[in-house]
Regions:
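Amphipathic, heptad-repeat alpha-helical coiled-coil/stalk segments that mediate oligomerization
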Residues: 1-166
Length: 166
């Protein structure tokens, strides 16, 4: 019995370490967060019955006015030929700080940082002008936030965030 308990404890500790490693990877590496967000987005499109390469295109290369290569995460092809551009943006670090906050001061700071992170993504996305660079694109770009908690936290902090982004 003692050996079984030790084994259970060892497995539990190994699981905790793996979970912490994954959380740290997502929290501290922008590229990992971005890849995760893109994967969530493409999974949703696929699970909705859309076919990659036919109804949506991942990381299509487009050029801006200066010839610089840009790659929106997804371009969805509408039935009428219009294009809907979707770019995934992840704000996980500040949200994780909010969830782990131990007092109101830490929570308030994390709420503000989360809002600022999302707003920074909005501004960066707006500067890319994807909608002007893709033929038949609708005049707006959708920003997909795969972490619903982060999105809700930002909207609760500033309900006008969506209209400001538009």
């Amino acid at each position: 019995l003692a050996q079984s308990i030790r084994t259970i404890i060892e497995h539990d500790q190994a699981r905790d370490k793996t979970t912490q490693t994954l959380a740290n990877a997502l929290k501290n590496r922008g590229k990992v967060q971005g890849d995760w967000g893109e994967q969530v987005l493409t999974n949703i499109l696929h699970d909705s019955g859309l076919r990659e390469g036919e109804e949506y295109f991942v990381q299509d290369n487009i050029k801006d006015e200066e010839g610089k290569n840009l790659r929106p995460d997804v371009i969805v092809k509408g039935a009428d030929g219009t294009r809907i551009i979707i770019d995934s943006k992840v704000s996980l670090t500040a949200y994780s700080d909010y969830v782990g906050a131990e007092d109101d001061e830490q929570r308030k700071a994390a709420i503000k940082a989360n809002h600022e992170s999302i707003w920074k993504h909005v501004e960066e996305l707006a500067k890319k002008n994807y909608a002007k660079l893709v033929d038949n694109a609708v005049p707006i770009v959708l920003m997909f936030v795969p972490n619903e908690g982060s999105y809700i936290l930002a909207m609760n902090h500033d309900a006008s965030l969506g209209s400001k982004a538009y």
